[in-house]
């Protein structure tokens, strides 16, 4: 079961933001979308998930146009954690997490799924707190926990699943960044196709099996970290002097200042 994009382009507010995208998203793999600001990363994620309509080309889930799949059915096939999370009402954390549980799940199972999601994301201590009293980083953690609840509820439907995370590590400390990315890798090991938008190239190199480097609305490089995280690849895409070095068994990126 794959998500396929063929000749895909997209526009937002009359501006062309994606063009000529051809790729497949595979199950059992973590794919990171990286690139400079305005490269089209979040738009590409939205197109893949079926939330943003492509201006041209085709986006298909196992051969079926993804936008033709009814929203309720689409929710059982993929989970999306969006970049922004605003909540003006004083819902408790457990209420927000339960909103991620699919309607098709029997009522008696919902509490078990919520409790499991809270445990898996180390958020049990927050379950009875109003979200309006949480910091931005804590709200980001709640948003991820809600996504986990949706994933766990979709297990009851025996459906192919994809997870889309838009900047999930923003506003988080290093410990919770690691937790989210480790969970993403665990979901891939369970057979999910995972797509993550990341600004931090070091996190992308550590967590991803595959990296798509975007620039100017196009995928300019597509491959494993060892082929994408290279000075000669990153420097022109980001228009910045970078150094890439090996340490602790992985690749790391640093910007050279003063050049």
Set out the residue ranges of the language-model regions.
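Conserved structural motif at the start of ABC-family nucleotide-binding domains
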Residues: 3, 18-20
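ABC ATPase nucleotide-binding domains
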Residues: 230-231, 235-259
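The feature captures the beta-strand-to-loop junction immediately N-terminal to the Walker
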Residues: 34-36
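Conserved ABC ATPase "signature" region
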Residues: 111-126
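ABC ATPase NBD Q-loop/coupling interface
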Residues: 58-73
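Helix-to-loop junction immediately C-terminal to a conserved catalytic motif
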Residues: 49
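Catalytic Walker B motif of ABC-type/P-loop ATPase nucleotide-binding domains
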Residues: 157-158, 163-167
């Amino acid at each position: 079961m794959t998500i396929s994009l063929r000749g895909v382009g997209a526009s937002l507010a009359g501006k062309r933001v994606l063009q000529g995208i051809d790729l497949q998203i595979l199950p059992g793999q973590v794919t990171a979308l990286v690139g400079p600001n305005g490269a089209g990363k979040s738009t590409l994620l939205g197109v893949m998930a079926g939330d943003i309509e492509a201006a041209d080309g085709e986006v298909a889930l196992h051969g079926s146009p993804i936008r033709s799949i009814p929203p309720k059915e689409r929710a059982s096939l993929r989970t999306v954690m969006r970049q922004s999370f605003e909540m003006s009402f004083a819902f408790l954390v457990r209420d927000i997490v339960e909103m991620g549980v699919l309607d098709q799940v029997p009522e008696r199972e919902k509490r078990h799924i919520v409790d499991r999601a809270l445990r898996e994301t180390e958020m049990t201590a927050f379950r009875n707190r109003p979200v309006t009293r949480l910091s931005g980083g804590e709200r980001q953690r709640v948003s991820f926990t809600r996504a986990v609840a949706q994933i766990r509820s979709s297990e009851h439907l025996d459906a192919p699943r994809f997870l889309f995370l838009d900047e999930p590590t923003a506003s988080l400390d290093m410990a919770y960044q690691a937790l989210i990315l480790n969970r993403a890798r665990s979901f891939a090991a369970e057979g999910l196709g995972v797509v993550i938008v990341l600004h931090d190239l070091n996190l992308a190199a550590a967590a991803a099996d595959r990296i798509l480097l975007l620039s100017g609305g196009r995928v300019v490089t597509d491959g494993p970290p060892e082929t994408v995280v290279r000075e000669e690849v990153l420097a022109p895409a980001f228009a910045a002097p970078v150094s890439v070095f090996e340490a602790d068994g992985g690749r790391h990126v640093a910007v050279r200042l003063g050049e």
